[in-house]
């Protein structure tokens, strides 16, 4: 009888269809500025502009634009809101930190350089971006070579 052992690596791994792309994306973190949006007809038009792209609205009531950090890390969007609250009473002063984090995976065809982020007066954080058109694969003239190889392997298994 032979004993089989398992070994585990402490090395961090990136789950990706293409490992080299995953490693390259891991090191690209961009922080987007959060601007305060005023209620105006132009703001509504700007909101309608995102119909053909990515749009996410988040409740950020109580946070100021400078308390919000919006980052794009590869295909992930991360929104962090952090506040320091002073609690004062006659006997002492104390501080309390409040932090909220939201993570969302972005569409693969989203252009991170074309993203905008704004905070409405009502406390809604809008993150928007334009999606680029994906190139369609060229039409093939005949059976797919992969399907053919799967068929031959399947027939070998039934023998």
Curated annotation (Swiss-Prot):
GO terms for cellular component: cytoplasm; cytosol; intracellular membrane-bounded organelle; nucleoplasm; nucleus. Testis specific. Residues 36-147 form the sHSP domain. InterPro entries: A-crystallin/Hsp20_dom, HSP20-like_chaperone, HSPB9. It is found in: Cytoplasm; Nucleus. Keywords: Cytoplasm, Nucleus, Stress response. PANTHER family: HEAT SHOCK PROTEIN BETA-9. Belongs to the small heat shock protein (HSP20) family. This is Heat shock protein beta-9. It comes from Homo sapiens. The lineage of its organism: Eukaryota, Metazoa, Chordata, Craniata, Vertebrata. The gene is HSPB9.
């Amino acid at each position: 009888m032979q004993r089989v052992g398992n070994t585990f690596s402490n090395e961090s791994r990136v789950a990706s269809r293409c490992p080299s792309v995953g490693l390259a994306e891991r090191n690209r973190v961009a922080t987007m500025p959060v601007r305060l949006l005023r209620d105006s007809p132009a703001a509504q038009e700007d909101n309608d502009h995102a119909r053909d792209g990515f749009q996410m609205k988040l409740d950020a009531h109580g946070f100021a634009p400078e308390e919000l950090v919006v980052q794009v890390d590869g295909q992930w969007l991360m929104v962090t809101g952090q506040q320091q609250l002073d609690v004062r009473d006659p006997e002492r002063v104390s501080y309390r930190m409040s932090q909220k984090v939201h993570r969302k995976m972005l569409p693969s065809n989203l252009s991170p350089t074309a993203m905008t982020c704004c905070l409405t007066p009502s406390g809604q954080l809008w993150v928007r971006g334009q999606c680029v058109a994906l190139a369609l694969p060229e039409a093939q003239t005949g059976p797919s070579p992969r399907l053919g190889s799967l068929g031959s392997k399947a027939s070998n298994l039934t023998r």
